[in-house]
Amino acid sequence: GFFLLKGVKNEFVPPQDQSVFITRLTTSLGSSIESTDAVVLKCEAFMSARPEVARVYSAVGGFGGGEVNAAMMFITMKEPKDRPVAEPFKHRPSQQEFIAFVRKELNKIPGIERAGVQDLSLSGFSAQRGYPVEFTVRGPDWEKLADIAHALMDKMKSSGLMVDIDTDYQLGMPEVQIFPNRAAAA
């Protein structure tokens, strides 16, 4: 199905300027919640300093509480008529123009492993994380799945047609396993 879409020249549902979007931020695996928070504070400072932005709200640690290296920022922009003309723009930027700028700039902040931006006007058509296009790779062999997923991601990246390419498969997250001595605990 992916290759059939090459011939489609228009979007089924074009993005809308709703003056709101989400950024999903990731620091390196094994980062503490404190170090992730410190990096997110830098991202908040960048966003808050932008004259196009009305409000910034951040949540560190993921919504399940177990993703210490993940965060989300909810960005509310000023209404289109109230947005100033500010560098690097030569006009009042649309939400989509600003999103492209933010994606590039947030990925430059030290400590950010990945900054993806989600346009909420397109999120209602997805089954999983809310992006306009998502793929699910399934099978019984985890190693093969990881290899296939990374090969698919490499092809998507090299095409230059897609942004925010990511996987929710994270190999290498440090963990501690505790096995209680039931006899001693009794």
Predicted segments with their positions:
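Surface-exposed amphipathic alpha-helical segments in non-transmembrane regions
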Residues: F2-G7, I22, S35-S58, N69-P174, ...
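Alpha-helical transmembrane signal-anchor/signal-peptide segments
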Residues: E11-T23
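A generic structural micro-feature
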Residues: P15-D17, E67, A127
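Active-site acidic-Proline motif in GNAT/NAT acetyltransferases
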Residues: L29-G30, R182
